[in-house]
UniProtKB/Swiss-Prot annotation:
Belongs to the protein kinase superfamily. Ser/Thr protein kinase family. WEE1 subfamily. The modification Phosphoserine is found at S40, S94, S120, S143, S160, S426, S469, S473, S482. Residues 398-499 are annotated as: Interaction with PIN1. Keywords: Acetylation, ATP-binding, Cell cycle, Endoplasmic reticulum, Golgi apparatus, Kinase, Magnesium, Membrane, Metal-binding, Nucleotide-binding, Phosphoprotein, Serine/threonine-protein kinase, Transferase. The gene is PKMYT1. It comes from Homo sapiens (Human). A motif (Membrane-association motif) lies at residues 382-398. Residues 437-499 are annotated as: Interaction with CDC2-CCNB1. Residues 16-28 have a biased composition (Pro residues). InterPro entries: CC_SR_Kinase, Kinase-like_dom_sf, Prot_kinase_dom, Protein_kinase_ATP_BS, Ser/Thr_kinase_AS, Tyr/Thr_kinase_Cdc2_inhib. Residues 110-359 form the Protein kinase domain. This is Membrane-associated tyrosine- and threonine-specific cdc2-inhibitory kinase.
Length: 499
């Protein structure tokens, strides 16, 4: 009887090596670890201005095909304020708002300057209030409420914002309202997100910036945790930059209050920044600290966080890849180890981290570095404006005749604008395509542009113009010289005849 060969024992992890690949007794080859995809640097990509839309449901029939459309009671056409502070919903009032006009409250009360981002959640616009002239950010939901539950879920974000309250490191909510089944949130205007800043930078952020962002975000988390609130979605896309190297924490859509009845129905955020205890359903303030630790690791090392796999497991077992963290200072590495502790009970809290000497007070050299970077950015913009002014003056001095030459009438009358400009609704000052009225068809535009030309017209009446009505009729007799048809071969022979 043949004896079974002894099973190979799994190699135990040594100092400086990542944890074992799995806990199974199946032997793992020594070279198997090299076949697994390791950690990598971030790949260059475009600025993150939007999120991918949600995939459509393929196994269900739209409700509009089963039931006739009807307007629910909460689908108000008039704007109504949304608040969970005990205030009753009331109609919004603004000096520039006229309820009799077809435009919405958003269109009448704000001047839209640009779109900051869009995705499946909705759109965010940079606007200027017509009431006080200040700049704000307005978040508008993409689609109307699908039902009472969907409306309650979207309006819960307003309640989460109101629970946060006022803090210098948290994005401030100005007001919220609903109109026509659409939710609007007006917040203070911040700079780009930390994710957009890193993508524009294209490399690891300087450690001076990292310390400042870490301290400000810890202050925001300490404010939330003191009220029993957990953010559950801390990541670079939800951290917004401000002046002088400061930052603010925003997007409280997944905020949960510990000890409430709805705490069991929480939603996790991005899996790349998820704490390991969330897989067991254990929600606490330590999850935000872990997510912030991965955020700092990503921006300080320009590291691409894995969505899953062995690298995802290693980061949640306390392993920090030395090929990325070798360039960090010993203080920052120690803070990352405290924040990425696998056990949430042993993980450092936001208050404990802020009590460290390296985070107790903002570093003077870090603040000076951020101020110097901002000054250089403004100086570069000023230099470009000055250079453009000098070029304009040089052109005027080199060609003084252009200054003295009077501006006469144009040599040719201006032509009609091209069809593409007339059909382009982006040049209109209206907000939506529906407000443009009946659209112009290409035939109508061409009918208006026929006869319009940039070349000078001759002084002739339409009667003197070329008449094309009889182009297919027979020509009048005697208008062309008569000729006798001949054979082509005979014509060729005549050309060859020397006589």
């Amino acid at each position: 009887m043949l004896e079974r060969p002894p099973a190979l024992a799994m190699p135990m992890p040594t100092e400086g090596t990542p944890p074992p690949l799995s806990g199974t007794p199946i032997p793992v080859p020594a070279y198997f670890r090299h076949a697994e995809p390791g950690f990598s640097l971030k790949r260059p990509r475009g600025l993150s201005r939007s999120l991918p839309p949600p995939p459509p449901a393929k196994g269900s029939i739209p409700i509009s095909r089963l039931f006739p459309p009807r307007t629910p009671g909460w689908h108000q056409l008039q704007p109504r304020r949304v608040s969970f502070r005990g205030e009753a919903s009331e109609t919004l009032q603004s000096p520039g708002y006229d309820p009799s006009r077809p435009e919405s409250f958003f269109q009448q009360s704000f001047q839209r300057l640009s779109r900051l981002g869009h995705g499946s959640y909705g759109e965010v616009f940079k606007v200027r209030s017509k009431e006080d002239g200040r700049l704000y950010a307005v978040k508008r939901s993409m689609s109307p409420f699908r039902g009472p539950k969907d409306r309650a879920r979207k309006l819960a974000e307003v309640g989460s914002h109101e629970k946060v309250g006022q803090h210098p490191c948290c994005v401030r909510l100005e007001q919220a309202w609903e109109e026509g089944g659409i939710l609007y949130l007006q917040t203070e205007l911040c700079g780009p997100s930390l994710q957009q800043h890193c993508e524009a930078w294209g490399a690891s952020l300087p450690e001076a910036q990292v310390w400042g962002y870490l301290r400000d975000t810890l202050l925001a988390l300490a404010h939330l945790h003191s009220q029993g609130l957990v953010h559950l979605d801390v990541k670079p896309a939800n951290i917004f930059l401000g002046p002088r190297g400061r930052c603010k924490l925003g997007d409280f859509g997944l905020l949960v209050e510990l000890g409430t009845a709805g705490a069991g129905e929480v939603q996790e955020g991005d899996p790349r920044y998820m704490a390991p205890e969330l897989l067991q359903g254990s929600y606490g303030t330590a999850a935000d600290v872990f997510s912030l630790g991965l955020t700092i690791l990503e921006v300080a090392c320009n590291m691409e966080l894995p969505h899953g796999g062995e690298g995802w497991q290693q980061l949640r077992q306390g392993y920090l890849p030395p090929e990325f963290t070798a360039g960090l200072s010993s203080e920052l590495r120690s803070v990352l180890v405290m924040m990425l502790e696998p056990d949430p009970k042993l993980r450092a809290t936001a208050e404990a981290l802020l009590a460290l000497p390296v985070l107790r007070q903002p570093r003077a050299w870090g603040v000076l570095w951020c101020m110097a970077a901002e000054a250089l950015s403004r100086g570069w913009a000023l230099w470009q404006a000055l250079l453009a002014l000098l070029c304009w003056l040089w052109h005027g001095l080199a060609h003084p005749a252009s200054w003295l030459q009077p501006l006469g009438p144009p040599a040719t009358p201006p032509g009609s604008p091209p069809c593409s400009l007339l059909l382009d609704s982006s040049l209109s000052s209206n907000w939506d395509d529906d407000s443009l009225g009946p659209s112009l068809s290409p035939e109508a535009v061409l009918a208006r542009t026929v006869g319009s030309t940039s070349t000078p017209r001759s002084r002739c009446t339409p009667r003197d113009a070329l008449d094309l009505s009889d182009i297919n009729s027979e020509p009048p007799r005697g208008s062309f010289p008569s000729f006798e048809p001949r054979n082509l071969l005979s014509l060729f022979e005549d050309t060859l005849d020397p006589t």
